[in-house]
Regions:
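Conserved nucleotide-sugar donor-binding subdomain of glycosyltransferases
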Residues: 1-38, 86-91
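An aromatic- and histidine-rich active-site surface loop
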Residues: 12-24, 39-59, 65-73
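Membrane-proximal helix-turn-helix segments that form the acceptor-binding/catalytic region
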Residues: 47-50, 54-57, 71-72, 84-104
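Acidic anion/phosphate-binding donor-loop and adjacent secondary structure
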Residues: 77, 128-144
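Acidic donor-binding loop of glycosyltransferase active sites
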Residues: 102, 220-237
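Carbohydrate-associated surface elements
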Residues: 107-110, 125-128
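Conserved donor-binding/catalytic core segment of Leloir-type glycosyltransferases
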Residues: 139-157, 161-167
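Nucleotide-activated donor-binding/catalytic signature segment of Leloir-type glycosyltransferases, i.e.
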Residues: 179-186, 191-217
């Protein structure tokens, strides 16, 4: 839509670009009075790297740029309908960060291979989980056959085939239909909701919305099945989502 077009062509690399100037000013005052060993920037939002770059240039301090996701090749960028000038500007910013930082950190070997085409040094540190919220030994699983997805679910990850199969199973078995419970905890795209409705699974579905991290962990621990999805896009083999590690924690 129009707002996506504005976002993609005028807010480069992202809407947080307006943080850069005031953040550099604020952090430079801190650096003038404190000694630090290293600056670590993490994105997205990739505007954070622009802040770190300016501080790195002004101070003799090492800089690690952490790429949790790709930059110019991020899967939802195509939704912004970027014009050539915007694409080129975004790419130039990315290449500048990759060349100027002392080291690039990223989450998977596949993404490392892509970044190494430009960056001089790339290291992999995978996602993990916070052990502070470990599963309790006395977790009671749902009595229903619960399938839960926790987190942001964009249209690119819409599990159409899964919904089709579940619809078929509900048709075949009234027992299965009564026992099935789909939980979506977090922000779910409208396209996914439409697909659920089209497959007559709406009565089996609970859209919980946003909850605290602790509540999300509780849903995760009591669910019979945890649903892990990655975007159905080009180069998705490099996507090693942090959700995988959160799910692995649920015993």
């Amino acid at each position: 839509g129009f707002l996506s077009f504005i976002r993609g062509n005028f807010f480069i690399p992202d809407p947080k670009v307006f943080w850069v100037k005031p953040s550099v000013s604020y952090l430079q005052k801190y650096l003038d009075n404190h000694t630090i060993d290293v600056i670590i920037s993490t994105g997205p939002p990739h505007s954070m790297h622009l802040i770190a770059e300016k501080l790195h240039q002004k101070n003799t301090v090492k800089w690690l740029a952490d790429f949790r996701d790709p930059w110019s090749d991020l899967y939802y960028n195509k939704d912004f309908n970027q014009l050539a000038f915007a694409k080129n500007k975004n790419k130039r910013l990315e290449e500048r960060i990759l060349r100027n930082s002392d080291c690039i950190l990223t989450v998977s070997n596949s993404l490392k291979e892509e970044l190494e085409k430009t960056a001089k040094k790339v290291e992999v540190i995978t996602n993990g989980f916070d052990d502070e919220f470990s599963a309790s030994n006395n977790v009671i699983l749902d009595t229903k056959f619960s399938i839960s997805y926790i987190g942001l679910l964009p249209k690119q990850s819409n599990p159409k085939l899964l919904f089709k199969v579940l619809k078929g199973l509900c048709k075949e078995s009234e027992i299965f239909k009564k026992d099935l419970k789909l939980n979506f905890i977090g922000d779910i795209s409208e396209e996914v909701k439409v697909e659920i409705l089209a497959n007559k699974l709406d009565k089996n579905t609970d859209f919980v919305g946003y909850v605290s991290h602790q509540e999300a962990i509780a849903y995760q621990n009591k669910s019979q099945v945890l649903l892990l999805l990655i975007p159905n896009v080009k180069n998705n083999k490099g996507i090693l989502t942090g959700k995988l590690f959160e799910y692995l924690k649920a015993k």
